[in-house]
Amino acid sequence: MTLSFITRWRDELPETYTALSPTPLNNARLIWHNTELANTLSIPSSLFKNGAGVWGGETLLPGMSPLAQVYSGHQFGVWAGQLGDGRGILLGEQLLADGTTMDWHLKGAGLTPYSRMGDGRAVLRSTIRESLASEAMHYLGIPTTRALSIVTSDSPVYRETVESGAMLMRVAPSHLRFGHFEHFYYRREPEKVRQLADFAIRHYWSHLDDEEDKYRLWFTDVVARTASLIAQWQTVGFAHGVMNTDNMSLLGLTLDYGPFGFLDDYEPGFICNHSDHQGRYSFDNQPAVALWNLQRLAQTLSPFVAVDGLNEALDSYQQVLLTHYGQRMRQKLGFMTEQKEDNALLNELFSLMARERSDYTRTFRMLSLTEQHSAASPLRDEFIDRAAFDDWFARYRVRLQQDEVTDSERQQLMQSVNPALVLRNWLAQRAIEAAEKGDMTELHRLHEALRNPFSDRDDDYVSRPPDWGKRLEVSCSS
């Protein structure tokens, strides 16, 4: 089957990119590819059997027209000016059978005009982390970019140490970022901001294209998508680590996996990025940061969208966030209905977990085993203050009895939203260390496990992290 690529971005937004081709690595070789995703995209298996090829930037497929995008942004709350694809190249936009498109973005593809002081490369460590994280999030049901392939090489890349140069093929319906809009707003070119908005609406919100108030309606949906995404992050204990405006997806996708982390111990102020000295992007601050970022996006639209309409959309953020968060957390607790005491029970559980440094994922998974007519709970042994847990658990069981469902029905719901497996940093690190020694077995094994996060397991993927695996420091270097 021949893959079809189109050039919408190149044709319709000529001032937003520089056309250039990838720079191949030395002795590049394909070490992992996503068979399930490749099948979904109708990619012939033969493309994965001819060396690094397109996956290593050595060849282009017919119809591809590679380019690096320019955008700007606020980083850690400070205007950073022009940024752009410093090591990534958009190879092409694949046209799928249903009329939708999928960007093929090659990360680590070499120097671009936007590399600034960088070398345009990615390392094996960071490409493995992004591949694992994006696929883990996908199978958790959270909107995200996806990983299609990893290529490693003999090219040295200099970071804190000398590492192997690598490339990741990332795919997504669009790589439109808040930062694209900021770039032209701060260059005082509002007509180009409008062109970006028109492009987005035409191709991704086409049902709004003929609406008189299309820009307000579109921005309102961007707000809603962002609020929903952040709510989902919070419910699974995911910390992004670097929520700069240039890392915010217009479509509400999780984008740019760098120093991310899933909660081990429940620590509301968890900081996964060791460069985040002030805790701006701490776990509990993510909802506020996302709203701040949306306010920056709204500012770029203010030359042609009524401020009252933009503010109305921004005002909807908190309610959308709380609605999505509340619905999911009630499911995690096994509540089939909404009752006035639900928030108090949840907050009391969080307080208990924070005092005890309880494991976030294990706590909710073990809670899924609760039988409402039994005072015994396998979760009890996870707490030191048994009296405090017993008090909470007694009130929790009374609350469960208000919903007329069987234990089996409730447990099935809870186990469908409380994963047994999340991508803890130590699991990723173990796969990385093996891969850096040439052994890809654990990389493939972990990828396979992450496809079924809600299934019970009895291996160390679902155990508490070892002492060395807790609070692994992760930086933005990739």
UniProtKB/Swiss-Prot annotation:
Keyword Nucleotidyltransferase assigned: yes
Catalytic activity field: L-seryl-[protein] + ATP = 3-O-(5'-adenylyl)-L-seryl-[protein] + diphosphate; L-threonyl-[protein] + ATP = 3-O-(5'-adenylyl)-L-threonyl-[protein] + diphosphate; L-tyrosyl-[protein] + ATP = O-(5'-adenylyl)-L-tyrosyl-[protein] + diphosphate; L-histidyl-[protein] + UTP = N(tele)-(5'-uridylyl)-L-histidyl-[protein] + diphosphate
Source superkingdom: Bacteria
GO molecular function, one term: ATP binding
Pfam family, one: SelO
Residues where ATP binds: G84, G86, R87, K107, D119, G120, R170, R177, D256
Entry's EC annotation: 2.7.7.-, 2.7.7.108
Residues annotated as the enzyme's active site: D246 (proton acceptor)
Function according to Swiss-Prot or TrEMBL: Nucleotidyltransferase involved in the post-translational modification of proteins. It can catalyze the addition of adenosine monophosphate (AMP) or uridine monophosphate (UMP) to a protein, resulting in modifications known as AMPylation and UMPylation.
Protein name, UniProt field: Protein nucleotidyltransferase YdiU
Organism: Escherichia coli O81 (strain ED1a)
Gene coding for it: ydiU
